[in-house]
């Protein structure tokens, strides 16, 4: 995507979208306990970047969640040929590239906007980092959200 695109301001058009997340808490708790067991046995080691005690502590805190339901709201906002994808969390860079390449507009991803609701990384990255281990947002939810954002932008382009 060329960074030399000229921004041309024009009409303001936006869509507000939502996505509901209701994880299976029994499954989530089993995964957390398995992660704790794997850390203690040495089977899971993220190296020096994340101390084992911190990761175990994070998982133990998450085990206290008996219920987790999340209704996310996010937006696609156009001002002329400038498009903002506004999201209340951290989307993996892979998703930002997908959203930017889905439009001919100058696209900006605004993360941590209107709140922070965990990390939304590609499903293949789940369980590999501090951001996804213990995350109550199930693997694969980010892909569904990004598909909604891209589809919304494409509808706005018509």
Regions found by a protein language model. Give the residues of each.
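Non-catalytic substrate/cofactor recognition surfaces at enzyme active-site rims
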Residues: 1-158
């Amino acid at each position: 995507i060329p960074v030399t695109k000229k921004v041309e301001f024009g009409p303001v058009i936006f869509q507000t979208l939502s996505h509901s997340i209701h994880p299976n808490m029994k499954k989530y708790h089993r995964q957390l306990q398995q992660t704790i067991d794997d850390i203690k046995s040495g089977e899971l080691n993220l190296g020096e970047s994340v101390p084992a005690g911190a990761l175990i502590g994070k998982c133990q805190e998450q085990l206290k969640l008996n219920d987790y339901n999340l209704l996310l709201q996010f937006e696609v906002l156009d001002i002329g040929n400038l498009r903002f994808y506004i999201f209340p969390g951290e989307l993996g860079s892979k998703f930002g590239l997908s959203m930017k390449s889905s439009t001919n507009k100058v696209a900006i991803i605004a993360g941590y906007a209107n709140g922070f609701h965990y990390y939304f990384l590609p499903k293949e990255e789940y369980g590999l980092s501090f951001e996804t281990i213990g995350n109550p947002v199930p693997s694969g939810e980010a892909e569904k959200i990004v598909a909604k954002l891209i589809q919304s932008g494409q509808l706005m382009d018509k």
